């Protein structure tokens, strides 16, 4: 008779033998999550309505014509170039809707928008074509750039849709040096579309969100939504707005500067693009205090020392001139209402990055490794304690926090059998910003 063997769930076997379980170590770890993802609603003259689409930095450089309707170097994409200087990816949403797609006898633009009016279809007789059996070469141009070529086509039904047009499969192909599509319109940007963006983006992960809207109602909408998402839903990110220091909240950053030559009526809020990207891409152990603006816009930095001090006290992120460079004066958010329960430390974006990193990482760790999987007993709570300690030690290793004492971290059973209560003490590190030096001359 063979000895018993196999795997076991409980130690209740009858036969003698070896019962061995082979299990993988848990894939979930306490490692730090990456930063560098933003979310941004924009007005476009090309693109699908009512949907979030994600673009990586590489895709933006290589495929901007296909995605946004303009080549990478176009003036219209200056803001997006600023945005992508410091991020890996961005979740976009087209704010304008209800536009018309350009069309001609042979094709209809893939997306609505006036950029569809630059589409041109050129058709010529293919080699071997005869009057009895015509064969065609069909070329698609977008803003003068050849973007598609299909050779030896017998009829329109044989054409394959491309990134720019959907073919009219019932069309009669005929020689044309260039037939333009027409009738494309951008549609309208409605206030409701901003809310649609916020609703759609809730299920995505990102580090910062922003808008260049100057409408106080829209800015208030973004600020209120950010506060709800952070405080009630538990999703940690920061929101960048233009001249909205009234938010008085650590989750909202207010950009103060306009561009050179802009009046109060013509302010573009263009610096929001760069700040959204820079804040999203800033590492958890870094600060943007004294960071150099590396974008394309000419920033108005005509502020006196008193105005700069007043801006800091009011919770405004402001750029100033340092020799020949434009730099961020201090990496702060709009929080200024200091209380015993919330100190001035919460006005530092570096501090908020650390706290957000902890909040997002530990939530992800718990939801992935523990939720519904690990018993809420002493062993399970010790495991969670170990993972949190490992996470915090990684933060301490990269000098994002200091003086971490594992013994002060507690993981206890909550009021119900399913609840776990964690009490955590962390001290975020901030970059040096002020030097107080006394020189004694002997």
Regions found by a protein language model. Give the residues of each.
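A glycine- and small-residue-enriched flexible loop/hinge signal that marks low-structured segments
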Residues: 2-48, 52-60, 65-68, 72-375, ...
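C-terminal edge-of-domain segments
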Residues: 410-442
